Amino acid sequence: MSKRDFYEILGVSKTADNKEIKRAYRKLAMKYHPDRNSEDPDAEEKFKEASMAYEVLSSEEKRSAYDRMGHAAFENGMGGGGFGGGGGGNFQDIFGDIFGNFGDIFGQSRGGGGGRSRRGSDLRYVIELTLEEAVRGCKKEISFTAPAPCDTCDGKGAKNASDIVTCQTCHGQGQVRMQQGFFAVQQACPHCGGTGKQIKNPCSDCHGNGVKDKSRTLEVSIPAGVDDGDRVRLAGEGEAGGAGVQNGDLYVEVRVKQHNVFTRQGADLYMDVPVSITDAALGKEVEIPTLDGKVKIKVAEGTQSGKLLRVRGRGVTPVRTTMKGDLICRVVIETPVNLTREQKDLLRQFQDTLDGDSKHQQSPHKKSFFKKIGDLFD
């Protein structure tokens, strides 16, 4: 019986790079893993087939041998080290590298109540804060649903401690070696889920998993100075790992709501300060808000629109620093609207006074603008 081409099994071209091969294998492994397909008799065979293909194509040496000689490269110990004994790659390393900490996907046993072989999965919770809460720090109560230890069996998965016995398939090792022809791969025992234990009489409430979904409420302390996208880690507050398995962590991710006055950039805060055309021309002291109360800033005589005024120490102290940023005020000069006839006449009279050299001296940007235009035609 002819063997299927490894590239065909993974659904990749012969020029595929390692990332494409890994991505293709991960997709197939998640689709056909025996612990997710206990009702499909062909799933385990397809899973092993994909694993064999990946073990060859993910190794530069074995892939090179396979490209030259095909399946014959691994028969009778030829080329690439073969797969028998200790010469081949460790499947558990491959599997762990790809799936990392997602024990919740493959951890449950098919044999009636096996536990999980990896720590519980980490959880993510997004929390919205106002700018003031993010800058000053706060306490927030969050509610969510996640797997937690079963109350009925205290997370053991069994009615009684005596119901937990050594797995007879792997003899307590948690690993089995699967042989198919000249291929041999090591994987988590399908009967105990890699724990090395089996449960004779599973807990009727959690069905031997040791965990159940529960609604939880926690108070989270948000440190002062957090910014949008920062995460607060709560160790051990993630998904419960089940009997004898470490819990995952809970990561609370911060989302800062848009403020109607301030914009934050790192340690500094920015704001627009509207100034009338007369105050900008004559100069004035203007009162502005900050997160710590009101302060006054000096708008100098002749200030132009867009001028940045810095108020030191009125910004933010980011997390893990002691240096406080500044408040940057951008002057926005407001042009008056809905003028009366008398006001328009007064402005025209004022405009008439801006003549000759003094006109350019009193309008420096306009002088610079016309000079630049003149330079274009010189």
UniProtKB/Swiss-Prot annotation:
Q: Which GO terms describe its biological process?
A: chaperone cofactor-dependent protein refolding; DNA replication; protein refolding; response to heat
User: What are the recorded GO MF terms, alphabetically?
Assistant: ATP binding; heat shock protein binding; unfolded protein binding; zinc ion binding
Which residues participate in Zn(2+) 1 binding? C150, C153, C203, C206
**Claim: tRNA processing is one of the keywords in the record:** no
The protein's required cofactors: Zn(2+)
**The record's free-text note on cofactor binding:** Binds 2 Zn(2+) ions per monomer.
Q: Which UniProt keywords apply?
A: Chaperone, Cytoplasm, DNA replication, Metal-binding, Repeat, Stress response, Zinc, Zinc-finger
Identify the domain of life.
Bacteria
**By its UniProt entry, which InterPro entries does this protein fall under?**
DnaJ (IPR012724), DnaJ_C (IPR002939), DnaJ_domain (IPR001623), HSP40/DnaJ_pept-bd (IPR008971), HSP_DnaJ_Cys-rich_dom (IPR001305), HSP_DnaJ_Cys-rich_dom_sf (IPR036410), J_dom_sf (IPR036869)
Q: Which family does it belong to?
A: Belongs to the DnaJ family.
Protein name per UniProt: Chaperone protein DnaJ
Which organism is the protein's source?
Psychrobacter cryohalolentis (strain ATCC BAA-1226 / DSM 17306 / VKM B-2378 / K5)
